[in-house]
Amino acid sequence: MLFNPHTGPQASQLLSKSLPSFGKQRALAVKAILRRAGLRPTRQRIALGSLLFVETHRHITPGMLNEEALLLGEKLSVATVYNTLNQFADAGLIRKISIHGERTYFDTDTGDHAHFYICDQDQIVDIASGDIGIGPLPVPPAGYKISKVDVLIHLVPETTPS
């Protein structure tokens, strides 16, 4: 099965359906995913891909992923993790979600869906694609086309009336 990051299965689906979640087989699967996405399988990309491309969909920050890598003995700088995540996003393997331009999450689910952002918990929660509708989009300026639409709904706790 060839992987097309724009139309094919998600990287996590390819990995979870074909291999166990450990060992050399996992590294080989990640290498294949990276090559199919047009990325050279470097040690750092393989290590981070092995943590990301699992059956469970997740939202993760570079700092969170760096901590996971450290627990497994993979010493990488946060900058390396951030750059690698951006490369994965550019290749269509994951989605990038920016919060106020200050904090960046990466989503392993590249399918169409929106997100809630729970402000006081700094947490991202998926909204199923069928649970939200978007009306007609505006016509873009001459010479441009719409490449994607991201929906992020910010949530704060309801206040109890006194």
Locations of the language-model features?
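Intrinsically disordered, low-complexity serine/threonine- and proline-rich regulatory segments
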Residues: 1-47, 53-54
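Alpha-helix N-cap and coil->helix boundary residues
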Residues: 43-44, 60-64, 80
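Basic amphipathic alpha-helical segments that dock to polyanions
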Residues: 81-91
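Non-DNA-binding regulatory cores of transcription-related proteins
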Residues: 90-162
